[in-house]
Amino acid sequence: MFARHVSLQLKPTMANEFPVTFEKEILPLLRKQKGFLDELLLVTPEKREVVAISLWETKEHAENYHREVYPQIEKIVNRFAEGIPTVKQFEPQYSTFHQPAFAAKV
């Protein structure tokens, strides 16, 4: 399993629209990607900061998505973001929700 962490600051006037756009425009693109497992969208109570965590079967799946589809998603996100979103990659070590993926490692 592999994870991507995208964080961004929302424009104040766009904060309420972003989760709706995420569900209608971004999530369908993610679901079509080979190796996509799950997405977690986190928004601060003030609705100014967003963290999106996507889980992938492999690092290669995440990298293919980043090369081939993320530029399209970035255009959508840029309508809502102040500044440039930050993208980080992680190797998940434990999850109570995705336990079977980690059991295979042991």
Report residues per predicted region.
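Glycine-rich beta-strand-turn "strand-cap" elements at beta-sheet edges
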Residues: 1-2, 8-11, 40-47, 75-106
